[in-house]
Regions:
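Acidic, divalent-metal-binding catalytic cores of TOPRIM
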Residues: 1-185
Length: 185
């Protein structure tokens, strides 16, 4: 996910902690962050007011974002603005800094009927590299398998999750199987 930080985020009382949280997600290899206008006066002033170590961390996140996107382009861009309310239906989606930080820390969730059985089923079909990656992401709390208890409950749990924040549908998937003895049964 690419977070594009608009100039409005630096105009009045920038949410420095949340912006630095977004930068931390980048450094951990989770997302990318760009500043829409690095020449904006308010942005330059904000960077200058940061302690040197935090300014260096911020720049590292920006540099890492360019490098990571060159190697593997992100598929979702989210615009971060402070003068609007969050709008998950906008193209691109538009979030406040607070909502972006909330979304940024959200693990990718895979909703399954039975946590252990379906998780193991997915890992069985993954090649060795994919399996290691999935296990690493799970260990780092970047991926979570959500037990739903049955096919009927998958939809309910997924809808409940998305109701918390409509943009969460971008960071989840549902996996289920058929227990039918034959196709179309």
């Amino acid at each position: 996910m690419i977070f594009v930080v608009k100039a409005s985020c630096f105009e009045t009382n920038p949410k420095t902690k949340r912006l630095l949280d977004l930068a931390d997600f980048v450094v951990r290899g989770r997302h990318r962050i760009y500043v829409e206008d690095e020449h904006d006066v308010n942005y330059a002033t904000w960077v200058e007011t940061l302690p040197q170590e935090l300014a260096d961390d911020w720049q590292l996140a920006l540099d890492y974002s360019v490098e990571a996107d060159a190697l593997e382009p992100a598929k979702l861009m989210v615009s971060i603005c402070e003068n609007v309310t969050s709008d998950a239906d906008a193209i691109p989606p538009s979030l406040t800094v607070e909502d972006a930080a909330l979304l940024g820390r959200e693990p990718f969730r895979i909703f399954v009927e039975n946590n252990d059985a379906d998780r193991n089923f997915l890992l069985t079909f993954a090649n060795l590299q994919q399996k290691r990656k999935l296990e690493d992401l799970e260990r780092e709390s970047l991926l979570r398998f959500e037990h739903c208890g049955g096919i009927g409950d998958v939809v309910n749990k997924l809808n409940s999750h998305i109701a918390q924040n409509p943009l969460f549908f971008k960071v989840c998937a549902a996996v289920y199987d058929s227990d039918a003895k034959s196709p179309n049964a």
